[in-house]
Amino acid sequence: MASFDAAERRNLDRHICMRCNARNSPDADRCRKCGYTNLRPKAKERRAA
């Protein structure tokens, strides 16, 4: 993880739209670009390749 907590929180505390992959605010109810309501939290750890 990053050594700067504020920067890490700013980058990782997001919701991702399952339809268009747009980044949304953490308190969003629907996507800012396409209006889709199925949002997931951004992954905090990288996936293994």
UniProtKB/Swiss-Prot annotation:
<dbReference type="GO" id="GO:1990904">
    <property type="term" value="C:ribonucleoprotein complex"/>
</dbReference>
<keyword id="KW-0689">Ribosomal protein</keyword>
<dbReference type="InterPro" id="IPR038587">
    <property type="entry name" value="Ribosomal_eL40_sf"/>
</dbReference>
<dbReference type="InterPro" id="IPR001975">
    <property type="entry name" value="Ribosomal_eL40_dom"/>
</dbReference>
<keyword id="KW-0687">Ribonucleoprotein</keyword>
<comment type="similarity">
    <text>Belongs to the eukaryotic ribosomal protein eL40 family.</text>
</comment>
<dbReference type="InterPro" id="IPR011332">
    <property type="entry name" value="Ribosomal_zn-bd"/>
</dbReference>
<dbReference type="GO" id="GO:0005840">
    <property type="term" value="C:ribosome"/>
</dbReference>
<dbReference type="InterPro" id="IPR023657">
    <property type="entry name" value="Ribosomal_eL40_arc"/>
</dbReference>
<protein>
    <recommendedName>
        <fullName>Large ribosomal subunit protein eL40</fullName>
    </recommendedName>
</protein>
<dbReference type="GO" id="GO:0003735">
    <property type="term" value="F:structural constituent of ribosome"/>
</dbReference>
<dbReference type="GO" id="GO:0006412">
    <property type="term" value="P:translation"/>
</dbReference>
<dbReference type="Pfam" id="PF01020">
    <property type="entry name" value="Ribosomal_L40e"/>
</dbReference>
